[in-house]
Amino acid sequence: MNTHNNNYQQRSMDSAIVTINDKGYIQSVDRKTCELFGYTIEELQLQKVNILVPSPYKEQHDTYMQSYFETGVRKIIDKSRVVEGLHKDGSVFPITLSVTEVRIWNKRMFIGSIESIIDKRLIIYTDVHGIITYCNRNVEELIGYTPAELFGKNVSALMPSPHAKSHSEYIEKNYHGGGLWKMLNRVRNLPIKHKSGVVFLVSILVTKISTDGIDMFKAIIQTPPKEAVFTINGDGIIKACNFNFTEPMFGYTQKDLLGNTIGLLIPEMSKIIDNTSLNLTDSHDPQLQQQQQTTTTTTTTTTTTSTTSTTTSTPTPASIAVSGNNISSPPIDSPLTTPSTPTTFNHSRGVESWLGRTRKVDVWHRDGSRFPVNLEIIKLQGENSMFSLQIKKVENPRVYGKDKDKNGGGGGTTENKDGKQLDTIKESKEHRHSKEKKKRKKDRDHNNNNNNNNNNNNNNNEQTSDSSDSSDSDSESRSKKKRSSKKKSRRDDSSSDSSDSETESSSSPHKKNRSSNSSSNSSHSNAPHESSYYQPEMIGEYTLGKTLGRGNYGVVKLGTHINTKEEIAIKILYKEQMTESEFTRCKREIEILKQLYHPFINKLLNVLEKDDAMFILMDYCQGGDLFHYVNKFGLKGVKMVNSPDIGDQVLMGVPLPEDDTKRIFTQICLGIAHCHKLNIAHRDIKHKNILFDNQMNVKIIDFGLSNWSYQEKMSFCGTPAYAAPEMLLGINYNGPEVDIWSLGVILYSLVTGKLPFINVTDMIVGKFILPPSIPLDLQDLIKKMLTVDREHRLNIMNVLNHPWLSKDPASSTLISQNLLHSPPVVHQPQPPQHQKIQPTSIIPNFNEVETLKNNILNNNNNNNNNNNNNNNNILNSNNNNNNNNNNNSNNNNIINNSNNNSNNNNNINNNINNNNNVNNNVNNNKNNNNNNNNNSNNNSNNGNNIPNSSNNTNSIINNNLYNQSLSPQNNNIYQHSPQHQQHQHQQQHSPQQQQHQQHQHHQQQQQQLQQQHHQQHHQQHQQHQQQHQQQHQQQHQQHQQHQQSHQQPPVYFPTQIISDDFNLTSQLQRTQPNQQVSFDTNQSYQQQLQQPQIPHQVLMQQPPQILSHSNNQPINNYYVGQQPIQQIQQLQQQQQLQQQQQQQQQQQQQQQQQQQQQQQQQQQQQQQQQQQQQQQQQQQQQQQQQQNDPNFQPHLRRIKMSKRDNSYNKRKSEDGDSYKKRDNQSYDDILKDEGNKRLRELQTYSEGDKSRQHYNRDSNDNSRDNNRYNNRDNNNNNNSNNNRERDRYKKNKNENFDYGKYKFGKSNEDEENKDKPNIVREKPDFKPSGSLKNDSSSNYGTISSGRNNNNGEEDEENKIKLKWHEPAEAKLPTEKWMLYPFKGKDQLDTIYLHRKKSFLFGRNRDIADIPIDHPSCSSQHAVIVFRIRKKENPNTGSIKTFILPYIIDLESTNGTFLKGEKIEPAKYFELRPKDKITFGTSTREYILLCEDSIEGDESEEEDSD
């Protein structure tokens, strides 16, 4: 029983989830539900849940729910049952359904857990002698054998006695002797024997198949279902039944039962059905036809002889037949044979008389056997009186027989010495039934010569009908013999069969002879198997061993290396059992495992793929999984979520010690932290997915449901028992927070031995109980991890930094070692950022801020060296938080403004190390205050080294950031947040920790003093502000005069100080070159520190302010010298007016430009219209000429001639127009044009003056011969070149040319077409193969044409299309084929590709390393590209250009061989004519032929062979 619960527990945790409201409408579904039923999420939302189930479950569900709302009786709530699901395509399949009620936001909702039942049917093929030739993989789970063990055995080895003894004789008598095939095409219930010796009942269907004249038998074996559902009307007529369960349970198909009465299966119900509505017909079953006739004649005679008997007795079920499909009911004698016969009933009520309670009745199988069931009838909703019948098999039939005998007054059970019940002798009613059954069998049998044979047949029929009782008795007798003998090893099948045959021989001597013959035959058939040797299955260099685990579409087996004996785990995924989405998930798991390399994540070794399966090779974890680790002593009383009797917490195992829990949980968190660092969320963390190696270290597996996180998703993944509330409710989530919830569930189970939640309602609301024995730190961690609000849920770094782990020395050491020495992370390349980087800087305290201002504005000769070396480092800052490279490069910065927390330690240390330089600069400034001219010179020199500020700074200043007050949440302006300090403390090495703490403590003290000083200064400043307002105006006038006399270089100055949780940033603005800055030399050094110099022409409404962290009051107002604010505002207004004037001028200029552009466009349009009119007139004239010319052929356009031809320019324009039209032409039209062009070439060459014409074979091809001939033309060798061209095309004048399915040129066999013009005609025998059968976009390749659109991107329309063809099989020796681009071939040689045997270089693939301006032809393992090579002639100095083919191996598994030698991957290898190429282990060879080597094809082919 525990095993059963355990299996159910694992199944229930891998189910799909559907959320339903109280009205039966679907609110949300998960991804697995969509895959299971074939719908999308949008199609299922707001639909009735009945869309997922067929009849009769569709009507039954509404009735159950309505009854629950009215009465509160939970028929299906909190219970699991096996029903049928309805796919979108109409197919029906079995599922397991569990419904749980939840309340969310005071609303009633229901959570449906749906699980697909795996097909566990055993399929066996045997020959005519019963020898097993094939069996599927379910044989190991059903009967314990492997396919290799059963191959070659006789099928009788799987049968217990007496079936094993009589099977061989039955085959000889019926098949070879021409007997009656009564056992074929019928579903029967028979016992079968497990490898361990246990006998149990199965449902079997045997059919005969013939393949190529060879007869074979196919047997489908499965365990009978335990539940069936019917829908009947008031007359007992079956209107609907479940599709998958009726045939294996009752032997009838759904088609046989629809329209017939329920009395066919339950004879007792025929009493409550109106007999007048039934018609008597014959049975369609050949076995029961004679039985129908016999019983009907018997009943008719009894009814005619005695009127009293017919009126007082109840009609027998044998007399009740079925109308529709001619099926008769099973035989039964009297009402005494049924267990719960009602004493009185009302005919008027009919089926309604059985409503309200569950009854135990007998159900008849089609083969004549019967078995007890529990029957429950409910009335469905609706106007028509329809009823639902739910039939459940009785688990222990003998207990039911015991109750039946007590109630019926006959029969019983006895007990042996061990206290176990044994079957006694049948009572008188059972004997009467068996005798009458034998009598009917004798009347049906025509061969009554031998009474012994008849007795044997009757005994066999008895054993068939009572197969369940015989199977139980055989199993108990066998177990009794094993206990008496006390042998550890199980007995052989032959010895058990012989012992059974001896016990049976005492009762029947005829059976003894028959069994001896069958046993000898079976032993003879098993002899070859015992001496045979089965070679183990191989995967690469590994042999497959035992099965480590199973899944929905694959298994995990142990693999052992042949030489090293190293053990690995091989995950085998069968493609035939996987859907497209599951196969995509498998590929995603492989891609994610390639990115992960961590000591606590199972490592991917290799991936192998075949046509029918995929093999994933991984490390073998010998320590088992976490589920078995916590379940060392076995599960007792296991209860799972959605189970029928739920009420307690789910028991997972024994609680682990705290030290062991910390070690395991820390390793799991470190592995998940590595995944989150790569933006990968696991989404299926559970006990089964956490393994242990031989040293008991954690290894995380099963990334099939993982995905790249940090993007909102609604898909439901993982196991419901570990799923977060947002997954159950269908709320968008990122991914990492879901993993934290699952980790919280695992942590709870490790310390308590139980799962935290009792039902789905508690999962959604986050209700769980923490035992008081758990430490307080651990309770706090579990509460924060199992928080329903995902925004307040901890992340993985907070979990690792929690006190429960950080206080433990072993855990903290493991965390620090893993984080400091974590494996390198390969970041994905980010796109280049074209925007300028805004300068920023980190300001740790206010002293350094003021010192920095003074260093910038008051540089002198003494600190020129320091500032020249560090000026860029001081002012060059970066606001890009994600740019790690800039953060690493600024380690030497005195003040580094960056929001990257991981680099703050180095910044603080750098600040500490550079304090001396700052102090020196301050002293130098103090000593040289009087040297104002030198300061200004230094500033002008240093200004060149300061980079220009980015546009981002200007935009921020223009938005008047000084009006924005700092956030009230950022109370600590100059102090880092505690989280940030703790993060710094963890990342520093042990020597730096004490230094950092001292610096932090000193920094806090300084900040407190500075804040007090700033508050006092701010109050004093407000008092004196009004008094000095007039002085500011005067000083402002003086300042303007001083500005005109002295121009200062542009400088940086702080405009705003922003505080956040981690650092203090200072945004700097650079003044424009035309702006001036004045310096008040009369001010003291302290005044200059308190009042930094700011340019007057700054677009700000008020000076920058620093707000106090306590009352948000300004600490210090920054302004220039004694200048008042009003004057600054006047300057701002003046500048605004100037800007408005400039904008008006710019608008006027833009309007003028637009008017000019419009005029130009109008002129261009007029010119285009005129050109179009001229072209139309020319076309009309040409059409008139063509109509007058009878010999004109529009499809034969002459090609371009030499430049010496008088019509060269005219033909060039014609060619240009024709290429423009090609974009809109179809592929067939282009083929016709190319073929016609080749014909016109030959005609043009034969006509006219040969001495004046220089023929170019194709205007777009630039072959090696053309390159060679053009070079000879440059060397005054035009005559020889022309002679060669003439000779070649004289020879090929009458030759045919093939392009795909079109053929060009004249045919010598067609005499009728000799005088007709050469036109394009389609080849009749053209048969495209491979990918060319479907002319889709995948058959085309593209190369760049070098043309860009207005946006600077490559135009899709200008891309050059390539297509690959396969030659006709009849033209193999001399057929010439080439990779033919349609345009852009000016730099390409003509390369012909010749098919040597059966195919040409496979399919094309997109490869980034191939030059985009050259076409390529690729195979499964290698690619051929064309590269440009230049060579200088030492005699003439001219440079020749060659286009040569090269081959590149793509790092394939099997490699590529060139001329018999394997080439190195990722390198270019030059190809030459007649080179032979072999790809991988393929036996096909390929030859690359150029134009010079085509003519001698036939002789060269013989030499190559």
Curated annotation (Swiss-Prot):
Residues 2-72, 108-178, 215-284 form the PAS domain. This is Probable serine/threonine-protein kinase DDB_G0280133. InterPro entries: Aur-like, FHA_dom, Kinase-like_dom_sf, PAS, PAS-like_dom_sf, PAS_fold, Prot_kinase_dom, Protein_kinase_ATP_BS. GO terms for biological process: intracellular signal transduction; regulation of DNA-templated transcription. It comes from the Eukaryota. Residues 542-805 form the Protein kinase domain. The keyword Manganese does not apply.
